Regions:
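An anion/pyrophosphate-binding glycine-rich loop and adjacent beta-alpha core
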Residues: 1-44, 115-118
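Glycine- and aromatic-enriched mobile tails/lids
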Residues: 3-10, 14, 63, 69-83, ...
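Accessory "access/gating" subregions that flank catalytic or transport cores
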Residues: 29-75
């Protein structure tokens, strides 16, 4: 409805969710038992009673599926670094079902990791961390240089403005529906936005104390890289499968059209 130009609200990006038929059919008490907390929160936020008027909603992404590579023991390619729950890729593929997040957190945290971490620790000898190693000094210098570079830009745009613009680009090009045209346009715009970020972002404060604006700027800088690789991956996967819906690959019934002959694999990108 939104894509067809029928959205509601100031930005024309919302739709109505009308419970009147369900209330008429099942009764308000039944709906209240099922959705009472949700309705109460909605009324508190909007000042509108969803039992009486349609709710105004907007579909939005919950998170991006996929994650860090882990082996059978849930250890990443960094020795000793275990990645559990939704942060890794192991228990889900191109789509998710309700409560999968809870399942993965319980399975990894309760059943797997207590055993695998113990086995790993039993084979190593704990020791003092040697911060005199050249790699430590190089990493510290890189982090400090990045902080100083962000603080030195002293531009005119806030970190949030870049974050919002990047989110809009990714949502429109690499959100619920994707197309070759949109993804190529995003892959042209994201590098431009990244250049604008590093030349015009304004980060108040200093790096000598806790600076949440600086912390946020570092995250948004990373988001620029993540957004680009997401769009590259979505463009490269020339099919529809799971939550990856390419509008060019649709059956006559409007369903996702897969291409298992060429894309029955998990993609891995190296940064």
């Amino acid at each position: 409805m939104v894509d067809a130009g029928h959205g509601i609200g100031a930005r024309k990006n919302g739709v109505y969710l009308d419970f009147s038929h369900a209330i008429e059919r099942l009764g308000q008490d039944t709906i209240s038992e099922r959705y009472g907390n949700l309705f109460a929160m909605y009324e508190k936020i909007t000042g509108e009673n969803p039992y009486q008027v349609p709710m105004r909603i907007y579909p939005a992404p919950h998170y991006t599926m996929g994650g860090l590579w882990v082996d059978y023991n849930l250890m990443s390619n960094v020795p000793g670094l275990f990645v559990i729950g939704e942060a890794n890729f192991s228990d889900h593929g191109a789509n998710r079902l309700g409560a999968s997040a809870l399942m993965q957190g319980l399975a990894d945290g309760y059943f797997v990791v207590p055993m695998t971490i113990g086995n790993y620790l039993a084979k190593i000898t704990p020791g003092q961390v040697d911060d005199s190693h050249a790699a430590f000094a190089d990493t510290e210098r890189e982090a400090r240089d990045r902080m100083e570079r962000l603080l030195a830009v002293n531009g005119s745009r806030t970190v949030d403005s870049f974050h919002i613009e990047l989110g809009k680009i990714v949502w429109e090009a690499c959100g619920m529906s994707r197309s070759e045209e949109g993804l190529k346009a995003a892959l042209e715009r994201i590098p431009e936005l990244r250049d604008e970020f590093w030349s015009d972002v304004r980060v108040p404060g200093s790096g000598d104390t806790l600076n949440q604006s600086l912390e946020k700027a570092g995250r948004v800088a990373d988001f620029m890289e993540f957004a680009e690789v997401m769009c590259y991956d979505a463009l490269a996967r020339d099919e529809s499968a799971g939550a990856h819906y390419r509008v060019e690959h649709t059956t006559d019934e409007g369903e996702a059209k897969r291409d298992d002959e060429n894309f029955a694999h998990s993609a891995v990108w190296e940064f």
